[in-house]
Amino acid sequence: MANIQIENLTFTYPGREQPALKDVSLSIRQGEYVALCGRSGSGKTTLLRHLKPVLAPHGKVTGVVTLDGTAISALPQRDQAARIGYVMQNPDDQIVTDKVWHELAFGLESLGCPQKTMRARVAEMACYF
């Protein structure tokens, strides 16, 4: 089963007639890397923001986004924060510390992760950069 499943997602911004997303379906399995490519205004950011309910834009939505079979919108915010990460297009809008290590540790620290576990997870993440 796909970890993230988007099924027939259609989204229309308020005051617009044309949907920004129309009948989008996508499966992403754990460990996969996915690149969304398209012109400016084609809906890439709008789609990604629907993976993180606190960032989802307001408007008319049909379809469903699930994580391991559960609608993302039904997950408690703490679970969403622990399981769903989001890197914005402009890093200046999201960087909160002045050191890469601290930036990688920020989310884990906010969740109360034990120091030893946090160090191991940050080291693991850092190998990708």
Stretch-by-stretch model annotation:
Residues 60-71, 80:
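Conserved ABC transporter NBD signature motif
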Residues 52:
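Helix-to-loop junction immediately C-terminal to a conserved catalytic motif
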Residues 1-6, 11-23, 55-58, 74-76, ...:
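A short, flexible loop at the N-terminus of ABC-type nucleotide-binding domains that lies
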Residues 85, 92, 98-109, 119, ...:
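Short helical segment in ABC ATPase nucleotide-binding domains corresponding to the A-loop/adjacent helical element
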Residues 16, 24-35:
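Pre-Walker A (P-loop) beta-loop-beta motif of ABC nucleotide-binding domains
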Residues 37-40:
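The feature captures the beta-strand-to-loop junction immediately N-terminal to the Walker
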